Amino acid sequence: MNISRELSMKKLVHSALNIVTHPHSPENYLKLFSAAQKLEIPVRVRGEQYGSIIHVSKLDKDQKLSPILGEIVKYTNIDKHSDWYDLVSKDVASEEDQLKIKQLPDHLKPNMARFSFIFFPDTHLMVFETYCDSKTLSINYAQKIVHDTLNNPLLLDKFGEVNVTVIPQTDQIDELLNLTGLKTLRIIKGIVNNLLGIVNT
C-alpha cells in the first residue's frame, strides 16, 4: 500500500481499528458515528486527558456505502479551581492570578491535537493518524476514545454494543484495504481541516 501526503511533506504514521456492530449493516455505521458526534460527550482517557470524535461526514455523499471521514481530537481538561504554581515566585499563584485562570471560558481546552480517520463500512476498518504535526495519539488512547464514544449508554438501545479492537499489524491493514479494491490510500492534509481521500488505481 502506497501512502502519501499532499500539501505537506510531514511525517505520517497510521494505525487501524476494527469496528463491528450487530447486525453488520454498512448503512448503520454512518448513523452511529453521526449520533455519537451529536452527543458531544467527551471520553476521559487518562487523568486530565480527554478525547472526542468530531467532523463526521461521508467521503462521497452520493455513494450509499461511502467511507466515513472524521477526526479524533484530544485535549487537556484542567481543573481551574486547583492550586496553580507560579514559576516566578516559586510558590502558589496569587489570588489575582488564580482569578484570571478561573475566568477562562469553560469551552476552551488546552493542548489540543487532532488526528484524521477514515472508516470503511464494508470491511469495518478505521484507519487513523497516530502522528500529526509532531503530536501523537497512542493506539490504546484511540481505541478507548472510539469504544467509549460508540458505546455511550445513550446509544446502546438504538445501536447495541459496538466491538472495537486494535489491528496490530500493518500487513493486516493492507490486506483489509485490498478487499475494497483500493490500492492507494492518499491522505490529504488541508490548511483549514483534515481530509482523508481515497484514490483508486
Language-model segments: residues:
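Long, hydrophobic/aromatic-enriched structural stretches that serve as scaffold segments
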Residues: 68-134
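Terminal interaction module
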Residues: 1-91, 133-201
